[in-house]
């Protein structure tokens, strides 16, 4: 008998690194997308925390009137924000090395671009990492598809909208009250409440909340009893058990009688796909709506659409909304322009009949 011993070649450092990066045995899966996700999200988070606490005021409108957003400059958690980059910068890429000094970079709102661009790269990489881990485990890719909805929404308000409006100063501020201000100004300038894609998004969010509550309460109400009255019902479930933990037939019968028969799902897989798809499609549509309104394809305008026989306008709810929009538009960026565009878009009145002679 002859035994042949083959000498095993040493595994290179790169191969070991690749095996570690793509291993599903790690407590936290890294993956190739993780190589981009971790540094970008850490950078965005670190810069956001520092800027929210200590960033100096930013000349957001580009008119030498800085706006303070950080805690050390008088704000609190509610009013604080990372202020968007200056309108003087517009859509120019503005990294630190493009500024003459750190003070100039801070004054023009450089941290906003740094945070937003790293954040968008990070969440896109997180989405890719979800697909990558699903692929390694032999799972279907629907987790990654579902997460594409919030990624699309974030991209719409932080990147697509500034591109459409021509300036990062029109992006959403990174704070609570700044978000609300962005929403009010967006309504004033684009009438988003009258845009059908926004309506679909509202239906997606509120409908998703309703369906989630209905599903959770139905399942909790139809659990198969495995414990006594003196024990928590949660002890009746063992992680990884093969048996159903609730009676879907009972839940189906209850809901079918409560509403009507065909309002209730009799297929658990179809039910859970619906629970995932409804809010995801709604958020997709909202992101598409914001992205189109970024280029001023705005919501429906039904202003002064009802008149009497004499031609006098009979105000409808659309006219009430329009008046509110004009009020909000007048109030924002109060020193950047004298009138909102809607009020300044009438016929041009001549102010000089003859041009003055210019002596060269």
Swiss-Prot record:
It comes from the Eukaryota. It is an enzyme of class 1 (oxidoreductase). Pfam families: Photo_RC. InterPro entries: D1/D2, Photo_II_D1/D2_sf, Photo_RC_L/M, Photo_RC_L/M_CS, PSII_D1. Its EC number is 1.10.3.9. A quinone binds at residues 215, 264-265. The chain crosses the membrane at residues 29-46, 118-133, 142-156, 197-218, 274-288. This is Photosystem II protein D1. It comes from Trieres chinensis (Marine centric diatom). The gene is psbA.
